[in-house]
Amino acid sequence: KLWVANGKGFSSKANPFGPSPVRAKEEVISHGASFKPGDQVEYIGGLFKGSMSIIPVPTDKDLVAYSKAVYKNVPYSIAKTNLADSSAPGFPIPMKQNQSSPIKYVFYVIKENRTYDQVLSDIPQGNGDTSLLLFGKNITPNQHHIAESFVLLDNFYVDAEVSADGHNWSMGGYANDYLEKTWPSSYGGRGGTYGGEGQREIANNKNGFIWNQCYRNGVSYRSYGEFVSAGRPTLSILKDHYSTKYPSYNLAITDAYRFQVWKKDFDSLLALNKVPQFNTVRFGNDHTEGLRLGRPTPYAHVADNDYAVGLFIEALAKSPIWNETAVFILEDDAQNGSDHVDAHRSTAYVAGGFVKRNFVDHTPYTTTSMLRTMELILGMPPMTQYDAAATPMWKCFDSTAKPFVFSAIAPKINTKEVNTVRNEWQQKSEKLNFVMEDSNNDYEFNKILWHGLKGNIPYPAPRRAAFVTPTEKD
């Protein structure tokens, strides 16, 4: 017999009663998720039910059947490749590695911890539950405009659970065995360290990350804040390939300021005709600090983050390289929120000259789908079996580049508004550590955010869904 232990069980689930950065009774914690006995928490780190399977040692015939079953369950297939609408001349996403693309510059923006329902559930064309909405169009007008002007992605899922594995998934196409097995302990307050983002060599991906892949394939690259700590890169591959002035994760620095630093660097590189082919940019203030007294409110943090994203798209849209540019934006994970489909469903955006306009795409995509699409554009092979098997985002692109007339929408709320209410939830926020993302109990953090923004409305409970397959009715 084979005894197979599976720490993640058979499925993820929805979590309408998941964490919330605006719930008054909830702590916002970075790198931690300890729970009190009896807590009914739909925190992503606690949704998985481990399993033990006892199966006969498979025969050769069994292995063939098992392999076919696995292949059938993989979203990507050769048949789907053949169905991709890529026959038009000039289609920008190659079907195979080393085919040329008219897109010459890729910008990859990484944000922090939001679910789809928290931000975009108020867009009627998408599959959203507005009862879980926290940061709707009034707070995130730029992201709404981007989603509605380009492609609304309402079936996008992050591959990771938390930031520890999330940044490694986002940059490397997987998190290694050490990291996957240790983050539950460190986040649960039972010992261990963060490890991710290059913090510990043992937690790094064996063959490196997407920057290593760029180096191996002669693709120029630069990082703004991603895998950078205290002003220094955490990976040797980023030496001489990062902005020394761009702030790394620090909630005391606004994302709007980060944009200004990036813009100055971008303009100088543009003038020299030396803009790298691949650029990673970190805008992480949508993480928020809960109700911490004297610190920006959750709404203020998210509005600041949204404005930075809007300014970023405006700058690229007005630049001479727009028609040769593709922008991909995602969250590293979706742990700090609720979603009625799945705790991994998150916001994602695609923009650029060749990106379709006013289009809704219900295709199931994941973090590795985005990675695979960028790899195809840049003429690089997949890094792992996960991005190799992911469905590329072909449906999001068109064969003709178009301009995009856009000016960033100024925040509709005061981004300097700070938390002033003194209550037990504000007091809990004072005890939290925001020096690094995910250093706190995320369930408590989400409850603080939820009740802080929603008052006494009951905290939303979990759903299991590997992917959602929309029907015509949907």
Please name every model-derived segment.
Residues 16-18, 39-46, 97-99, 134-135, ...:
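Short consensus segments that form the blades of beta-propeller domains
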Residues 13-14, 21-24, 30-34, 43-48:
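Short, solvent-exposed loop/turn segments at conserved positions within beta-propeller repeat blades
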Residues 65-474:
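N-terminal pro-sequences and low-complexity stem/linker regions of secreted or lumenal proteins
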Residues 2-4:
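Conserved beta-propeller blade signature
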Residues 50, 61-65:
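Extracellular (secreted or membrane-anchored) zinc-dependent metallopeptidases
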